[in-house]
């Protein structure tokens, strides 16, 4: 509990946050060009995918101590003293302007006007609790090959919730989409490996027979991407292959160095140490992954989740009386040790003798809360591998394998994939890229669907219905503080929209909102809007207190938060192609991003 030294007491005490992962010390990530968007060509190994790669990584929150304006206002937080007992630390409360600056410093908003692309706009933001932040994110737009009969972009949005370091999430933000693109390229070219997954695979069988007698096999089926199970299989294969590369990289490097006779010298740091750490750290740290892939040509949205980040969609439902509500659709399910389906899956993959130990206290082997993750090799390597790598590479303090580590792997990166047909409930006319101003009534919101992707730092404090209601009310023009019930009136009951009975709508941490007007509508960026309201919303003092606590103390009260909100409408008929059609909305001049080749 926070002890107030303010001239007036805090409105409500703040709950301590229970970390999901044991903390680990890690060096800061390499310098990045903050707030800069890069466009570069991406090659996929085939002709079916070409075009531009657009990404933006998370900015790091390094500046935690800004001077207060005027007379400082102080409060105290409990800390563990060096003697092992409890003590307190006095902190300075951020001013209102400093709080706003902290909330907004990483936000970005983009308007999209690309031909045959249903994305109207997307807003992003991240807020660090760890230092450096362990979350990351990306946005990627790929163009189909110009010769393809199917027109429309392939759009990827990803959020990555790292733990025990930032290295794995950073690798996912730069590599995962490339792995998925390579698998999709095989699907688009009708590869036999995916054609064989068709319900009637006679075409692939005849192709094999034809190949045996001729050198010119028939043209592969070019329509494999019509089949959702095949697209899901491609995404799953990409996730698994990237994770295998991450986990096996240190093992391959050790074999290579042993053959070359150049193992790191334990008494001095050299090139070999640097090379070893670059392979070892992404494998030792871990990350959840949430990837939304929008296939504009097929008008479908594929959402893949590994871990416990969440995706939720709001769908506008007119009531025929000049109004309507936003229907809540959960697009993911938390993969944690408290999910009965995940517990049953893990138990089925190990001997019955381990049934009581594979998941204990809601954690894999009593340690890891998410049951699926990239990296986390201490739950995947064969027994003895970690000790061998530590002896050869001398990485410093590294936790050993968990207890009852008998039949690895215990954790997988293979995702669950949900597919949504966006042609259902098609909207009316598409808005122009400049029509994102508030509307005066809910009769004509500027988008008829939106998707929210976020790491669990957001869902710790807001449930799915609250998130859809907050975005939906914002799109319907609400701009004044609201009670919770008032905000929830903008959405329909989500109970029937849940993909399972495993509480996908419940925040993991009981919020401390209090009564009255608890939600605020003061931010133009929808991701910032959600982040602010997750921390207290209209309870301004609570928001300031939470943001005034520096790392690592802040980790006891809140997690890193990364959020992307995507507005969807009718695909544009006359939008731009090539490298055009993506505009910064929140930074003048209002010009498209330029390619950097």
What would you call each of these model-derived segments?
Residues 2-597:
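PP2C/PPM-type serine/threonine phosphatase catalytic domain
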């Amino acid at each position: 509990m926070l002890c107030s030294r303010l001239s007036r007491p805090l409105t409500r005490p703040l709950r301590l946050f229970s970390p999901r992962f044991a903390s680990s010390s890690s060096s800061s990530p390499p310098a990045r060009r903050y707030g800069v968007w890069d466009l570069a060509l991406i090659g996929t190994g085939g002709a079916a995918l070409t075009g531009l790669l657009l990404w933006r990584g998370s900015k790091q929150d390094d500046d935690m101590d800004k001077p207060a304006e005027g007379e400082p206002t102080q409060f105290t937080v409990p800390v563990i003293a060096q003697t092992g007992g409890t003590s307190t630390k006095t902190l300075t409360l951020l001013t209102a302007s400093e709080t706003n600056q902290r909330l907004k410093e990483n936000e970005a908003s983009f308007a999209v006007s690309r031909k045959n692309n249903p994305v109207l706009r997307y807003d992003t933001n991240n807020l660090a609790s760890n230092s450096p932040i362990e979350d990351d994110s990306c946005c990627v737009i790929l163009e189909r090959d110009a010769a393809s009969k199917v027109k429309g972009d392939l759009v990827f949005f990803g959020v990555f919730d790292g733990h025990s370091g930032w290295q794995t999430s950073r690798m996912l933000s730069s590599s995962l989409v490339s792995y998925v693109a390579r698998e999709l390229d095989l699907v688009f070219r009708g590869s036999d490996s995916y054609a064989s997954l068709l319900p009637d695979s006679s075409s692939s069988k005849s192709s094999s027979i034809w190949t045996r007698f001729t050198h010119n096999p028939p043209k592969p089926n070019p329509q494999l991407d019509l089949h959702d199970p095949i697209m899901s299989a491609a995404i799953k294969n990409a996730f698994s292959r990237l994770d295998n590369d991450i986990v096996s990289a240190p093992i391959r490097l050790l074999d290579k160095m042993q053959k070359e006779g150049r193992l790191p010298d334990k008494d001095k740091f050299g090139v070999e140490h640097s090379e070893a750490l670059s392979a070892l750290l992404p494998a030792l740290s871990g990350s959840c992954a949430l990837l939304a892939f929008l296939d504009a040509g097929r008008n479908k949205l594929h959402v893949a989740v590994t871990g416990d980040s969440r995706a939720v969609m709001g769908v506008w439902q007119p009531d025929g009386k000049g109004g309507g509500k936003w229907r809540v659709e959960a697009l993911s399910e938390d993969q944690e040790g408290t999910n009965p389906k995940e517990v049953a899956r893990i138990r089925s993959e190990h001997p019955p003798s381990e049934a009581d130990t594979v998941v204990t206290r809601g954690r894999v082997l009593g340690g890891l809360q998410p049951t699926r993750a990239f990296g986390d090799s201490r739950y995947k390597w064969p027994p003895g591998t970690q000790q061998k790598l530590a002896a050869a590479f001398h990485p410093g303090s590294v936790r050993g394998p968990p207890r009852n580590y008998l039949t690895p792997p215990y954790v997988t990166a293979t995702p669950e994939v949900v597919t949504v047909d966006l042609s259902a409930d098609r909207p009316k006319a598409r808005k122009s890229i400049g029509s994102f101003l508030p509307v005066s009534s809910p009769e004509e919101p500027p988008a008829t669907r939106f998707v929210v992707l976020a790491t669990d730092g957001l869902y710790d404090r807001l449930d799915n219905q609250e998130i859809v209601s907050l975005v939906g009310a914002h799109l319907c023009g609400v701009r004044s503080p609201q009670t919770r019930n008032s905000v929830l009136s903008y959405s329909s009951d989500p109970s029937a929209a849940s993909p399972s009975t495993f509480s996908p709508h419940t925040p993991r941490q009981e919020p401390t909102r209090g009564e009255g007007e608890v939600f605020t509508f003061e931010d133009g960026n929808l991701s910032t809007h959600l982040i602010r309201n997750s921390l207290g919303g209209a309870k301004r003092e609570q928001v300031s207190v939470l943001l005034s606590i520096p790392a690592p103390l802040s980790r006891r009260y809140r997690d890193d938060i990364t959020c992307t909100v995507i507005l969807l409408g009718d695909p544009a008929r006359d939008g731009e192609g090539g490298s055009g059609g993506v505009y910064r909305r929140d930074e003048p001049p209002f010009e498209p991003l330029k390619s950097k080749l």
